[in-house]
């Protein structure tokens, strides 16, 4: 019997939850409840989010599932169109039948022209087979009570939005969220459920005058803040000190480099930091991704050298040329006859453009363009 691949509907919700819960419970050796862990996606009224999953069916039975959420990621005045893959599961009896390959083919065929980039979290060796490579950079910044001991103490109030009513504050929370330099476009009613994903605690922050001054999404198991927004990022030292005083432990914060002023400030008040790849990426639209990322770097780092660079790769339909002037960046594909400055094969292209530990490939000032910032806050 052939395997049927199609997008799910709300009628498939219970079957999807059953497959995900059983597959991940067995893999993680603990009970997993996707409805509670991912309320934005699997709550009883989240019909549109169920429909952003591809399912594999054999004899009418769901045997495989993979998410493909189409999202807009705003970075300054630019927008990256992204496809968030995840919730990938294949029933044990169906493994080895090409189910995962068929689902990824369906996702690629239906989303590649709609999205600049796709990403997921998982084992590099497994997902490289489908065009995903580990790259990009996230800063895991560690804060300690000792490091902030000289910071003035302010008594902030931290309210768990799972157990306290927050609807009256939704507009203020959204205003803080959308004032950030980079953020995923979300509907108002999706913000708090999104901050609750993966079992995290969505916390609303009030200052001493009981006015909202920010929010955090806190992972209590790993003692880390996975997402945050403050009205004034220069209050971060006081907010973090107050929060660590409340929970009586040191914490880490995950940050990107799109907003360099924020990143530099957090590093300056931190104990230490490490840099790692945030995800595995499959780039569908090299022109737009490179243009947005290099434009961002140009805006964040003054006096980045100007010039042009033509790159050839077996992963590209033809060579592409990057041109950077003082305030503008352009990226376009060129004919194969174009003389290229550098040729990169396979995933070396990703490491060249977005690799953390990147060697100097070019040997002149254009090396300062790279690595380009690439990050996903999800």
What are the functions of these language-model segments?
Residues 87-90, 96-109, 233-245:
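Conserved acetyl-CoA-binding loop-helix of GNAT-fold acetyltransferases
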Residues 1-70, 77-80, 84, 148-188, ...:
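Short amphipathic alpha-helix that is part of the acyltransferase structural core
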Residues 57-61, 206-211, 365:
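A glycine-centered beta-loop-beta connector
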Residues 138-246, 256-258, 288-305:
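Amide-forming acyltransferase catalytic core, primarily the GNAT-like/NAT-type
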Residues 125, 133-150, 241-378:
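Active-site/acyl-donor-binding loops of N-acyltransferases
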Residues 51-55, 65, 87, 200-204, ...:
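Short hydrophobic/aromatic beta-strand element in the GNAT-like acyltransferase core
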Residues 121-124, 130:
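Glycine-rich, histidine-containing beta strand-loop boundary motifs that form or position
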Residues 104, 110-122, 247-258:
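Conserved GNAT acetyl-CoA-binding A-motif
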């Amino acid at each position: 019997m052939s395997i049927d691949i199609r997008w799910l509907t709300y009628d498939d919700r219970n079957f999807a939850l059953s497959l995900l819960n059983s597959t991940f419970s067995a893999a993680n050796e603990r009970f997993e409840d996707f409805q509670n862990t991912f309320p934005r996606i699997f709550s009883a009224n989240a019909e549109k989010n169920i429909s952003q999953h591809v399912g594999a069916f054999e004899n009418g039975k769901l045997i495989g599932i993979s998410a493909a959420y189409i999202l807009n990621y705003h970075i300054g005045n630019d927008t990256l169109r992204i496809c968030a893959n995840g919730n990938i599961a294949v029933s044990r009896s169906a493994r080895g039948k090409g189910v995962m390959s068929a689902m990824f083919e369906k996702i690629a065929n239906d989303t590649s022209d709609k999205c600049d980039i796709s990403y997921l979290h998982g084992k590099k060796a497994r997902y490289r087979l489908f065009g995903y490579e580990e790259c990009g950079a996230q800063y895991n910044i560690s804060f300690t009570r000792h490091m902030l001991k000289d910071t003035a103490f302010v008594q902030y109030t931290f309210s768990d939005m799972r157990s306290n009513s927050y609807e009256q504050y939704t507009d203020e929370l959204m205003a803080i969220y959308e004032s950030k330099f980079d953020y995923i476009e979300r509907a108002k009613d999706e913000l708090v459920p999104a901050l609750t994903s993966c079992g995290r605690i969505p916390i609303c922050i009030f200052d001493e005058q009981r006015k909202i001054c920010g929010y955090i999404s806190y992972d209590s198991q790993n003692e880390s803040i996975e997402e945050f927004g403050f009205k004034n990022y220069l209050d971060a030292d006081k907010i973090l000190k107050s929060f660590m005083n409340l929970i009586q432990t040191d914490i880490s914060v995950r940050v990107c480099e799109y907003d360099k002023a924020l990143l530099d400030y957090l590093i300056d008040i931190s104990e230490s930091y490490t840099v790692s790849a945030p995800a595995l990426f499959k780039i569908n639209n090299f022109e737009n991704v490179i243009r947005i990322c290099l434009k961002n770097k140009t805006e964040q780092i003054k006096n980045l050298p100007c010039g042009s660079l033509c790159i050839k790769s077996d992963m590209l339909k033809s060579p592409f040329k990057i041109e950077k002037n003082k305030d503008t960046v352009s990226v376009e594909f060129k004919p194969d006859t174009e003389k290229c400055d550098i040729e990169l094969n396979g995933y070396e292209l990703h490491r060249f453009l977005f690799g953390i530990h990147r060697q100097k490939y070019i040997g002149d000032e254009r090396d300062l363009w790279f690595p380009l910032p690439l990050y996903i806050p999800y």
